[in-house]
Amino acid sequence: MRVAVFLSGSGTNFTAIYEEGKRLAGMGGKPYAAIAAVFTNVPGCKGALKAAGLGIPVLALSSKLFFSALGRDPDDDEVRDYYDAAALAMIEEICKPDLIVLAGYRRRLGGMLLGRYRNRVVNLYPGDITKDYLVRGVDASVQAIRAGESSIKCTVYLERPHERFGPALVQSEPVSLDGYKEEDAEAMNELIRSEGEWRIYPYAVHNLIAGGRLGVDPDDNVYLDGKRLGKEGYQYVG
């Protein structure tokens, strides 16, 4: 399976996915996702530099300069599609990806790209997307503490146009928040990354998606090995 990774920052989830693919490839005979290209809207970001150092083709198109040159609002849906079309043109010269993985990509994708790659664009949220208390602009860990939660799960999900979250594919094991307070957001987020994100994202991409075990019907119901899952998706156990 050919994968294009979109990123904007340090690329820690990209690294986790790459390392697991390398491990699986070394074992031989197991299906895995090969990262064929990395795209970034922030040229020179740490994740892009990591990918280049690994010999992976890196494609960069500054979203800041793109929208500035057009003199248009970067959140305008039409202009969003212009940018996405330019990004896809660059990527598809390198490969025709079977899957697009958003790994800390800080731009919302438009309807054109998501329609063209329907059910083939995945993202990760460092919290439980089924919770009804989630708001934008506040760390998931802080929201969990405010809601009285003693633990948190992170979620791999499918991207959908005009929706914050599409259907959940996989959730991590609960990550304990015992002893943490709101002001400990940075420490909580690091814990969630190490005990949640870096475990389930590689597992979802390689073992479940590349392994051909996940399916989605027209009503956005998710199936694992032909069995319909609940709204929380598959519950990962490491």
Please give the residue ranges for each predicted region:
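One-carbon transfer enzymes
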Residues: 1-238
